[in-house]
């Protein structure tokens, strides 16, 4: 499992012209599920999403986490994130978990984050064509693995 996180001033996800998830200041996390991702890996990634320090303290140093700021978390499933791009000019998707494995893993991640984070957790819609709108703050972007 991997997450491409972006510090945002706002972000939203739209499906069929309806906003299905939106946050103000916080993190947008694009989530790629890989075959065999364990519950321990899912829990560890949730912990990292909530405790990774990407927000500025009073001195402007990245010393505050999402848990510290109480900002929003927008989770968006993105199977292309787990693609194999090591050769050729076309991605391969054998390194991404199939939907029947990926959807429960993504939902588990969202449930853990909701349980642990007071700042609000929103999601896109698994398997749907989504339009993601965001304002990246910084820009600040990191790739996290459990």
Curated annotation (Swiss-Prot):
<comment type="similarity">
    <text>Belongs to the DTD family.</text>
</comment>
<dbReference type="GO" id="GO:0000049">
    <property type="term" value="F:tRNA binding"/>
</dbReference>
<keyword id="KW-0963">Cytoplasm</keyword>
<dbReference type="GO" id="GO:0106026">
    <property type="term" value="F:Gly-tRNA(Ala) deacylase activity"/>
</dbReference>
<dbReference type="Pfam" id="PF02580">
    <property type="entry name" value="Tyr_Deacylase"/>
</dbReference>
<comment type="subunit">
    <text>Homodimer.</text>
</comment>
<dbReference type="InterPro" id="IPR003732">
    <property type="entry name" value="Daa-tRNA_deacyls_DTD"/>
</dbReference>
<protein>
    <recommendedName>
        <fullName>D-aminoacyl-tRNA deacylase</fullName>
        <ecNumber>3.1.1.96</ecNumber>
    </recommendedName>
</protein>
<dbReference type="InterPro" id="IPR023509">
    <property type="entry name" value="DTD-like_sf"/>
</dbReference>
<dbReference type="GO" id="GO:0019478">
    <property type="term" value="P:D-amino acid catabolic process"/>
</dbReference>
<keyword id="KW-0694">RNA-binding</keyword>
<dbReference type="GO" id="GO:0043908">
    <property type="term" value="F:Ser(Gly)-tRNA(Ala) hydrolase activity"/>
</dbReference>
<keyword id="KW-0820">tRNA-binding</keyword>
<dbReference type="GO" id="GO:0005737">
    <property type="term" value="C:cytoplasm"/>
</dbReference>
<feature type="short sequence motif" description="Gly-cisPro motif, important for rejection of L-amino acids">
    <location>
        <begin position="138"/>
        <end position="139"/>
    </location>
</feature>
<comment type="function">
    <text>An aminoacyl-tRNA editing enzyme that deacylates mischarged D-aminoacyl-tRNAs. Also deacylates mischarged glycyl-tRNA(Ala), protecting cells against glycine mischarging by AlaRS. Acts via tRNA-based rather than protein-based catalysis; rejects L-amino acids rather than detecting D-amino acids in the active site. By recycling D-aminoacyl-tRNA to D-amino acids and free tRNA molecules, this enzyme counteracts the toxicity associated with the formation of D-aminoacyl-tRNA entities in vivo and helps enforce protein L-homochirality.</text>
</comment>
<keyword id="KW-0378">Hydrolase</keyword>
<dbReference type="GO" id="GO:0051500">
    <property type="term" value="F:D-tyrosyl-tRNA(Tyr) deacylase activity"/>
</dbReference>
């Amino acid at each position: 499992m991997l997450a491409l996180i972006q510090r945002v001033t706002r972000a939203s996800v739209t499906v069929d012209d309806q906003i299905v998830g939106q946050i103000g200041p916080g993190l947008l996390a694009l989530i790629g599920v890989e075959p065999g991702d364990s519950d321990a890996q899912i829990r560890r990634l949730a912990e990292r999403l909530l405790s990774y320090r990407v927000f500025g303290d009073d001195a402007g140093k990245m010393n505050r986490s999402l848990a510290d700021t109480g900002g929003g978390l927008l989770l968006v499933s993105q199977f292309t994130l787990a693609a194999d791009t090591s050769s050729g000019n076309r991605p391969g998707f054998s390194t991404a978990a199939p939907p029947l494995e990926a959807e429960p893993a993504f939902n588990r991640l969202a449930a853990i984050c909701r349980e642990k984070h007071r700042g609000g957790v929103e999601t896109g819609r698994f398997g749907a064509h989504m339009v993601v709108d965001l304002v990246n703050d910084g820009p600040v972007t990191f790739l996290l693995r459990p």
